[in-house]
Regions:
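Metal-dependent phosphoester-hydrolase catalytic domains
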Residues: 17-39, 213-214, 225-238, 245-359
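Sec-dependent signal peptide recognition
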Residues: 1-8
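C-terminal motif of bacterial Sec signal peptides marking the signal peptidase cleavage site
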Residues: 13-15
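Beta-strand-turn-beta hairpins that frame and shape the catalytic cleft
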Residues: 41-51, 148-162, 176, 181-205, ...
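Solvent-exposed loop/turn segments at secondary-structure junctions
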Residues: 56-59, 104-108, 134-138, 160-161, ...
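Surface-exposed cleft-lining segments at the edges of enzyme active sites
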Residues: 71-76, 104-106, 170-179, 205-214
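N-terminal, active-site-proximal structural segment of metallo-dependent hydrolase catalytic domains
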Residues: 17-149, 357-359
Length: 359
């Protein structure tokens, strides 16, 4: 997602301290920690862990916002609560042990100040959470955006420790003012205290969508370095998120039917065909590469128009093993067992992490 030019801020910022907007982050800083209001008993897993990644579009469901060629900037509290209830129902239905979320709002004007991390903890069987901001400003005086606080979160049945936000590089092609208020991409790493497992980590990220300056590829490289370091240290990890990249052997790379004509350029992945090759070659993917090559459609996890799923942007990887055949994109009743297209522009992706191999 890309913000419109915030030229309205130029005279404002020239006459005051720009730090008043608080948009920046340290290279590494502690995550914000959460706990459900009422904890649910979490037994030790026996054979597998259910792992899910899900971009929830900040509880926006199928409201058409300005970057989608719509007119909306903010939601009412009623809209947010209805949409969050739908998302919570999906999470309860899939019943993950570890849930990696992207585009989660906490105390943001656009989502009526609903803390969506706390909402999902309090309305599912997940107990603990860690949050890392990717878009933060106390106030954006443009188009009614107001306070912005959105990011990535990892929720789990068991405690999360050593949770940290690791900053990713920003787009260098943007004008300085846009870059100041634009998303600050990050990795959220957290150790999950799964009973019977030592040194088990969750790595969650949401990578750059629109860049022509190599930023996305650089971010993927940093993610690879993070995973390589954990692997070299003997740790076990599950990694996932919205990578905003297509796998090799994608039949379509641009000119998707669900794109709109507006302020924002459509998604084109031409020239990026090899961006995820190292992840697929070095680690186990919940989406087998050969199955995707044979038939792309069952693995599509994004729908821009709310009518059909058109491409694959969301992934799960591990340096251990997934249960064979357990990876699935929950598109609808026939493909994944539950209708999801009405609640977000992304579908949840799940897989079963094989405990016996890891242990």
């Amino acid at each position: 997602m890309k913000l419109p030019l915030l030229t309205v801020l130029l005279p404002l910022m020239s006459g005051c301290d720009a730090t008043m907007f608080r948009t920046g982050f340290e290279p590494v800083e502690p995550a914000i920690m959460y706990q459900a209001a009422t904890l649910t008993d979490a037994e030790a897993p026996s054979e597998a862990l259910s792992v899910v990644t899900y971009n929830i579009k900040f509880g926006g469901a199928r409201i058409t916002f300005f970057w989608e060629c719509g007119e909306r900037y903010n939601m009412t509290s009623e809209e947010v609560n209805v949409n969050m209830a739908g998302l919570a129902e999906i999470v309860r239905e899939i019943d993950p042990d570890i849930l990696m979320l992207q585009e989660v709002d906490i105390e943001a004007t656009r989502s009526a100040y609903v803390d969506q991390v706390q909402y999902l903890l309090d309305n599912t069987d997940l107990n603990y959470g860690a949050y890392a901001s990717q878009w933060k400003s106390d106030y954006i005086p443009s188009d009614g955006l107001g306070r912005t606080e959105s990011g990535i979160a990892t929720l789990a049945r068991w405690p999360l420790v050593e949770a940290e936000r690791v900053a990713l590089p920003l787009q260098v092609e943007q004008p300085a003012l846009d870059r100041y208020f634009y998303l600050k991409r990050a990795i959220l790493r957290a150790q999950v205290e799964v009973p019977g497992m030592d040194d088990f980590w969750s790595i969650n990220t949401h990578l750059e969508a629109f860049s022509e300056d190599g930023t996305k590829q650089t971010q993927i490289g940093i993610l690879e370095e993070e995973l390589m370091a954990l692997d070299a240290a003997g740790a076990t990890f599950v990694a996932g998120g919205d990578f905003n990249s297509l796998p090799r052997d994608s039949e379509q790379l641009s000119d998707f039917a669900d794109e709109c004509d507006g302020l924002f350029k459509g998604d084109s992945y031409v020239g990026e065909e090899d961006f995820l090759d190292t992840l697929f070659s070095d680690y186990s993917s919940a989406m087998p590469a050969d199955e995707y090559s044979a038939d792309n459609a069952p693995w599509f996890s994004f729908s821009g128009d709310g009518v059909e799923w058109t491409r694959t942007l969301d992934y799960l990887f591990t340096n251990a093993s997934w249960v064979d055949g357990s990876g699935v994109v929950h598109q609808d009743v026939d493909q994944g067992g539950i209708e999801t297209i009405q609640w977000s522009d992304h579908a949840p992706v799940s897989a079963l992490f094989e405990l016996e191999v890891a242990q």
